[in-house]
Design a protein with these regions (language model features):
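Short, structural beta-strand-to-alpha-helix junction motif
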Residues: 3, 17-21, 66, 322, ...
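Catalytic alpha/large subunits of respiratory electron-transfer oxidoreductases
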Residues: 96, 210-545, 563-566
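A basic, amphipathic helix-loop patch mediating RNA/tRNA/ribosome contacts
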Residues: 19-53
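Fe-S ferredoxin-like electron-transfer domains
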Residues: 46-189, 194-222, 228-230, 237-240
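Short strand-coil-strand connectors
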Residues: 7, 53-55, 499
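Conserved short loop/turn motifs at secondary-structure junctions
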Residues: 10, 33-38, 143-146, 176-185, ...
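Eukaryote-biased recognition of intrinsically disordered, low-complexity regulatory segments
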Residues: 1-7
């Protein structure tokens, strides 16, 4: 750790932090246009300059300059303010003053900086270079007349999404951002470039010209297109959804959404969706109120239960139940109906995995977070199509692998996006991925083997993995026999069987539903624990299935987020 002063405010930051990060921790504003916490510093805009009191007159770009111990940084000296104003005036030379018709007005970083630094006129006049507006994409409009060449869209596409769809074209005064050959966008349409653009150069076509940002209010929520539960901001105008944007990244997060999350919101307002309950009368479905529909269903179920018993009523769950819905469904089955079988459309090969989890003795299976992936040395993806089912996983893995010597293993029956990047692609026969995963979980179980002390903290027993009946687990065990910090990701449980597993665990085991957990990305499998005193920081359970302490000591904690993701 190092200690320095920013505008006479003392702040301590980890060694290797930049001056800009130190200023942010001290609560001191430093202007930027090209900086985005999700990507590497670039230093293109030169607005973030600061001055070192010990070296007066020497302006330092704070976004990529490492902070040093006992520095004394000043951000509002006359030299700094003059440099910032001059740079803003130079940027405005080729930026049109069309704020009244620009969709970015009201949330434009350049507009905010011009007002903050009182830029009343642009003294540097020159003939504007005629750029272009590309409207060929169905979702993203690129208006290069407003581009300030900060490079954020170019870098975020390459560093996180791994597509390098955008690049700098030409040189000098004629430099523009575009695609190779000037073609239309042909990418994943993740919307990262739109979310990072500080001006109105990249626009969401579903939102453009439909309203103004000061007329909408933001509601923090999560995307519900898959089980990753990415945090998102829903922009509403008079109760109508206008757009969805990634939420500001918190610690350990990247602030990501995929194409479905950012541009698929119109599905929520489809006229084909049911808006009110319907009750069948005289052979036809007719709209009804909620009270009438609930009473109608209750009478029908009660009549069947009285005539044929509770076991005659089978419950079939949906695959995208939230944790709260799963808990309510389980309570309804247990307390109201008094029993009855429960199942899901996607039972498949997941039953054995559920049985292994339900039969664990003292094992702790906890939900992971992006922070866990950042700290991992190795990532094992169990099941194919992870990036296709959950597109946000792709930029997460790309960003993780750029941080150094990382090991990616993918167990799949077919090549997919992550398989092409894997350092250890493992192929199993179609239909046997679930069987392989079950064998892996069984090998990790405390009843089967006891992990060596040096590997216990990783929850991995490589010796047990090597005994997986000649399956690819042997290769996996040899690969990680030195005990790297391993992170497991099981995409199939996040989607098809998540609801069923959640309900089954709730019904058969009464396990704790951790609805306060952060976003769950996968499973971090830990070693058995010794019995411990109850945690004082855990909130008291107010509803849902009762908690049980399984045999063998430690409480089995199955971490679920509110998208029912294990």
């Amino acid at each position: 750790m190092i200690t320095l002063k920013v505008n006479d405010i003392e702040v301590t930051v980890p060694r290797g932090s930049t001056i800009l990060q130190a200023a942010e921790k001290a609560g001191v504003f430093v202007p930027t246009l090209c900086h985005d916490k999700r990507i590497t510093p670039y230093g293109a805009c030169r607005l973030c300059v600061v001055e070192d009191r010990k070296k007066p007159g020497n302006l330092i770009p704070s976004c990529f300059t490492p902070a040093r111990d006992r520095m004394e940084i000043l951000t509002e000296t006359p030299a700094v303010l003059d440099a910032v104003r001059t740079q803003l005036q130079l940027i405005l030379v080729n930026h049109p003053l069309d704020c009244p018709v620009c969709d970015k007005a009201g949330e434009c970083t350049l507009q905010d900086l011009v007002i903050r630094y009182d830029i009343a006129e642009a003294p540097f006049g020159t003939e504007r270079f005629a750029r272009y507006v590309d409207r060929r994409s169905p979702l993203i409009e690129r208006d290069m007349t407003r581009c300030v060449l900060c490079g954020r869209c170019v870098r975020i596409c390459g560093e996180l999404q791994g597509r390098d769809e955008l690049e700098f074209l030409h040189r000098g005064y004629k430099t523009v951002v575009g695609t190779d050959g000037g073609r239309a966008l042909d990418c994943d349409f993740c919307g990262l470039c739109v979310s990072t653009c500080p001006v109105g150069a990249l626009n969401d076509k579903l939102f453009k010209d439909r309203t103004r940002v000061w007329k909408i209010r933001k509601e923090a929520s999560v995307c519900n297109h898959c089980g990753l539960a990415c945090r998102a901001d829903f922009h509403l105008e008079e109760g109508r959804l206008r757009r969805v944007t990634p939420a500001a990244p918190a610690a350990g997060e990247k602030g990501l959404l995929c194409a479905r999350g950012q541009f698929g919101w119109r599905a929520f307002e489809s006229p084909s969706r049911l808006g009110t309950p319907q009750v069948r009368r005289d052979g036809a479905l007719r709209e009804a109120g909620w009270d009438e529909a609930v009473n109608h269903a209750a009478k029908a179920l009660d009549a069947v239960r009285r005539s044929h018993g509770a076991e005659s009523i089978a419950l079939l769950t949906a695959d995208h139940l939230t944790t709260e819905e799963a808990a309510a469904w389980a309570a309804f089955r247990r307390d109201t109906l008094g029993g009855g079988p429960i199942g899901s459309i996607q039972a498949g090969g997941y039953r054995r995995i559920l049985e292994i989890l339900a039969g664990a003795r003292g094992a702790r299976v906890a939900g992971g977070t992006p922070r866990d992936l950042d700290e991992a040395e190795a990532l094992v993806v169990l099941g194919g199509g992870a990036a296709e089912l959950h597109p946000v996983l792709k930029p997460l893995v790309n960003g993780w692998m750029r941080k150094g010597d990382k090991d990616l293993a993918v167990v799949s029956s077919w090549p997919d996006t992550l398989t092409r990047r894997a350092t250890l692609p493992l192929t199993v026969a179609p239909g046997l991925v679930e069987e392989f995963c079950a064998e892996l979980l069984e090998a990790l179980g405390p009843e089967r083997t006891k992990p060596p002390a040096e590997l216990a903290r990783f929850g991995i027993d490589s010796c047990a993995l090597a005994r997986l009946s000649g399956r690819e687990g042997t290769t996996l065990a040899c690969r990680y026999s030195d005990g790297p910090r391993l992170y497991l990701f099981m995409p199939f449980l996040l989607d098809e069987a998540a609801g069923r597993v959640a309900v089954q665990v709730a019904v058969t085991e009464g396990s704790y539903f951790d609805t306060t957990a952060k976003t769950t990305l996968g499973w971090v499998v830990a070693a058995p624990e010794e019995p411990a005193a109850p945690r004082r920081d855990r909130p008291q359970q107010t509803g849902g299935p009762p908690q049980k302490r399984p045999p063998g000591g430690a409480h089995r904690h199955i971490g679920l987020d509110h998208r029912a993701s294990l």
